[in-house]
From Swiss-Prot:
Protein name, entry field: 3-demethoxyubiquinol 3-hydroxylase
Taxonomic lineage from the root: Bacteria, Pseudomonadati, Pseudomonadota, Gammaproteobacteria, Thiotrichales
Cofactor(s) this protein requires: Fe cation
Family: Belongs to the COQ7 family.
Principal cellular location given in the protein's record: membrane
Amino acid sequence: MRKLSFLDRVIEELDSYARFTKVPLNPSKKSPSSDTIDGKLSEIEKKHSAGLMRVDYTGEICAQGLYRGQASVAKSPQTKEHLYHAAAEEYDHLAWCGERLQELGARPSLLNPFWYWTSFGIGAVAGSISDSLSYGFVVETEKQVMKHLDSHLKSLPVNDNRSREILKQMYIDESEHAVEAEKAGGKKLPKTVKAIMKLQSKVMTTLAYRF
């Protein structure tokens, strides 16, 4: 098997990004909301739910970018495989959120290309330093995503049963991903790096909710 050139990798990532942003996506697992019936939502409630799900969709776009960026420069084959596997599992979350956005009559954030490639760059930089730092970013990312999911579960309209089932399953999965990354040797990130990640996350959630 020939080694991929830099150009080959660029083309591969562009193709992957094109697949991630194509709606609807084809998840490997059916949505947790498949057998759930919604209560009646007012237009205001529907708009709020759409904003929250748009944020969660963008969060999954960021996860795809981060993991694929890390995997593209991973030091060991095991780390590379672990990260691509994590990205594949996050793909289901992306598909579920995209499907729910369609049900709510909403679209993904217009800024997703920016967030994907920014996350890809951060992942590539972290991954080029060391695998342990790369796993550290996974741990911190998953913990921040879990905080968002928890706040969204509390903020969802009472009757938005379908969105709630999706976010509950995502929370469980993200928790498992964080534990797996810690077991793989995730290095604890400096407080400054965590603060920057939180700031970036705050900007992303604010913009994605509206745009």
